[in-house]
Amino acid sequence: DCLDFGFMEQMRARTSAKKQDFWLMGEVIHGDYARYIGDGQHLLHSVTNYELHKGLYSGHNDHNYFEIAHTIRREFDENGGIYKGKKLYSFVDNHDVDRLASKLNVKENMIPIYALLYFLPGIPSIYYGSEFGIEGRKEGGNDDPLRPALNLEELEKNPPAEKLPAWIKTLSDVRKKHPAARTGRYRELMLTNRQYAFARLDETDALI
């Protein structure tokens, strides 16, 4: 571990005293994510969900929604999910892994993948530029291709994935409108290798 747990606890106390909504997120690749969050009041607010990241793209490449659903069931199931009630940081790509558009066999699968990112349990995040569907792969040990300078005006006019920016905006609007999409319970409804239906629900709202 890079950070001492006592240090994280002191950092949480001091930052919260300075600014109540100061948010602490950690990058954790392996191990028990819950260790770094604890009860949610004394350590970090969230950590990266690398386990889900892998399934989101490989489950589509392999036509295997069972992989994604198994991860979510293990992590967030109503009856015994090991991270139930915790808010993990969900992502499809970041500064250390290949861009989603470069990992997919079928680029159109970015549409359902971003829907899952926004509505499965977790805090959805978008790595800069990926909202346009740009590509990027590591070259050996060089991460520079993952972290390019971007011409936003050009990308807004001609995004590589034409439908993706508007789709992500729609997903964001729905998530903002419905609290159940953010904090509701997760319930699996139907699952085959190519079909996956689930609900997010609370006392007043439900989304399927």
Where are the regions a protein language model picked out?
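Hydrophobic, well-ordered secondary-structure elements that form the walls
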Residues: 95, 117, 129, 171, ...
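Conserved interdomain hinge at the start of the Helicase C-terminal
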Residues: 110-112
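Substrate-binding cleft of secreted/luminal carbohydrate-active enzymes
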Residues: 114-117, 121-135
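Carbohydrate-binding surface patches
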Residues: 173, 189-208
